[in-house]
């Protein structure tokens, strides 16, 4: 058994007071990196956020449709993503430390942005930027953005083990996690993307979500 309890989405962010431009695709990102040479980077793979960013670069350049039914052949996949890999190689010289090394993880990159070493960052928490502005971690002029074609996202699931000793109780807990009330509270305190269908909520329930700033 499994059920969704939250969603996540890759976002990028910059400070509009320092960099008024907001790259909307890989081509604009390259020009952005050239203009702010040494001030752009991403977490080293296999960091979760860094990996998502690289996958997003791949999808933005070569699309994702061709991979749906592609045979599990490493060479075929490598050939398909080569244009994106070539782009990353072209991008490298303009990155922090000329792309020779990368921040070891997302929090390191985030601190570099806060300290002014970088003019751009990225996060897998869609509302994390807003939360960081609210608590003073980020400047009030920091803004989040996505590419025009969108960014990678996923749904998080909670599951019941096949050998669970109390399936009924686990279902009750899951139902509670999926309830509009708990989803709204998670949205408010954890800034996670809710899994509820907004169109099916009552007016009172909708107001609970609408009132979250």
Q: Which functions belong to the PLM regions below?
A:
Residues 1-108:
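Extracytoplasmic ligand-binding site segments that recognize negatively charged/polar headgroups
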Residues 43-44, 125-126, 190:
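Short secondary-structure boundary segments
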Residues 151-152, 156-212:
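Mature extracytoplasmic/periplasmic domains
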Residues 31-35, 58-62, 89, 93-96, ...:
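Sec-exported extracytoplasmic/periplasmic mature domains
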Residues 54-57, 131-132, 186:
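Hydrophobic packing residues within well-ordered alpha-helices of enzyme cores
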Residues 13, 123, 178:
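A conserved hydrophobic position in a structured secondary element of the catalytic/binding core
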Residues 96-163, 199-206:
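Extracytoplasmic/periplasmic substrate-binding proteins
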């Amino acid at each position: 058994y499994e059920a969704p309890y939250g969603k996540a989405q890759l976002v990028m962010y910059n400070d509009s007071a320092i960099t008024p431009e907001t790259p909307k695709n890989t081509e604009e990102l390259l020009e952005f990196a050239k203009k702010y040479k040494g001030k752009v980077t991403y977490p080293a793979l296999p960091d979760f956020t860094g990996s998502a960013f690289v996958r997003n670069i791949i999808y933005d350049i070569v699309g994702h449709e061709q991979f749906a039914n592609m045979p599990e052949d490493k060479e075929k996949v490598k050939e398909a993503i080569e244009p994106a890999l070539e782009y990353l190689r072209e991008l490298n010289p303009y990155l922090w430390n000329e792309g020779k090394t990368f921040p070891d993880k997302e929090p390191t990159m985030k601190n570099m942005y806060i300290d002014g070493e970088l003019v751009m960052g990225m996060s897998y928490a869609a509302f994390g930027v807003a939360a960081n502005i609210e608590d003073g971690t980020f400047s009030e002029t920091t803004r989040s953005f996505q590419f025009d074609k969108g960014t990678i996202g996923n749904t998080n699931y909670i599951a019941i083990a096949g050998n669970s000793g109390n399936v009924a109780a686990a279902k009750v807990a899951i139902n509670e996690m999926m309830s509009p009330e708990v989803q709204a509270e998670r949205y408010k305190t954890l800034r996670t993307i809710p899994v509820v269908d907004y169109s099916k909520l009552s007016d009172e329930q909708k107001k609970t979500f609408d009132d979250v700033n």
